[in-house]
Design a protein with these regions (language model features):
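Paired acidic/hydrophobic, glycine-rich loop segments that form the ligand-binding mouth/hinge
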Residues: 1-2, 158-163, 179
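Hinge/lid segment of periplasmic solute-binding proteins
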Residues: 3-56, 68, 179-183
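Extracytoplasmic/periplasmic solute-binding protein
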Residues: 46-56, 74-118, 157-159
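Glycine-centered hinge/linker elements that transmit conformational signals in sensory
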Residues: 115-145
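Extracytoplasmic/periplasmic substrate-recognition and gating elements
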Residues: 172-235
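C-terminal capping/gating helix-and-loop segments adjacent to ligand/active sites or protein-protein/ligand interfaces
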Residues: 198, 236-239, 255-310
Length: 311
């Protein structure tokens, strides 16, 4: 049976998933690190990645930005300012906000008991917060969600972060200037750090109640192998977790999926409880409003509220 990766802990605790024991190393090698992470809990692989297409990356207008510009956030902002354009990101949304913290090595995950771990208020988190504040204070930055991005890219906006679900609208707006790539690096503590992200995957699991686990594993492996994922992409447009399919000419011809595949190397599964989203959004909104005079206190509050919500 298939399941979204954010259900893995519930299924494991219900003893519903059979551990992958056949061709485990091969399956790990054939799929992206982010997808394998999504199918793994407490060091055990519990499923076969099928897709890896629920995530985010950078859309950009290549009449304004070069391939070199989009490698770094500094490059994007400098080129945007020079052209009188804006870079857009929904900083007041915890899903996107986390990219800075995750990129700088912070943790937002669950422990073995299913409790939320969030260390955004440590030294690395503070450095990431300072980078977010610098972004929000930059004249070429424009905060806002996906409606703003897909409506204004090609006009006031030259680049923005979102997912595949707006690719058709962005492509229509930009035409021949349509481009996409992985997220950029950002300046953090005087160094360039790659932005992280969340990646959502569909996973095929083997039911522990099966009387034929070997045959079930063989079937699951077949249904998620390279050829099956390629056919699924060609017929349905699903983004592959298989590294060979992700690197194929077929996927490369779809800039959004190619960008998502490139970003997946820096993505983690969304093991996040509901208590994170509201305080994270509030933290981002404060920085957008230029209210970041005591970042450490703000981070302490974010983490306290995130963890307290589960008690």
């Amino acid at each position: 049976f298939s399941y979204p990766d954010d259900q893995i802990i519930t299924l494991v605790k219900a003893d519903a998933l059979y551990e992958v024991t056949r061709n485990r190393d091969q399956i790990i090698a054939e799929n992206s690190a982010g997808a394998i992470n999504a199918a793994t809990y407490d060091g055990v692989l519990y499923g076969y990645p099928m897709t890896a297409d629920n995530g985010y990356f950078l859309y950009y207008d290549k009449s304004v930005l070069t391939e070199e510009d989009v490698q770094t956030l500094d490059g994007i902002l400098a080129a945007a300012e020079k052209a009188g354009k804006k870079f857009n990101m929904d900083v007041a949304n915890g899903w996107y906000l986390a990219s800075f913290f995750l990129g700088n090595g912070c943790q937002l995950t669950l422990d073995a008991d299913g409790k939320q771990i969030c260390d955004f208020n440590n030294e690395k988190g503070l450095a990431a917060a300072e980078a977010i504040k610098a972004l929000c204070d930059h004249p070429a930055f424009l905060a806002g969600g996906q409606d703003l991005l897909q409506g204004s890219i090609g006009d006031t906006i030259c680049a923005g972060i979102c997912g595949t679900w707006i690719s058709s609208a962005v492509k229509e707006k930009l035409g021949d200037n349509y481009a996409a790539c992985k997220l950029p690096t950002f300046t953090c503590g005087g160094e360039q750090v790659q932005m992280g992200s969340f990646l959502g995957c569909k996973i095929l699991g083997v039911n522990t109640q099966t009387a034929h686990p070997v045959e079930a594993m063989e079937l699951a492996e077949y249904l998620t192998n390279e050829q099956s994922q390629l056919r699924r992409f060609e017929a349905l447009g699903y983004g592959p977790s298989n590294v060979n399919v992700a690197a194929s000419e077929a996927v490369a011809s779809e800039p959004a999926l190619a960008a998502l595949a490139a970003q997946s190397a820096y993505a983690i599964s969304q093991h996040v409880l509901g208590g994170y989203w509201t305080p994270a959004g509030a933290f981002g909104a404060e920085l957008v409003a230029h209210n970041g005079s005591d970042l450490q206190a703000m981070l302490d509050q974010l983490v306290e509220q995130t963890v307290a919500a589960q008690n």
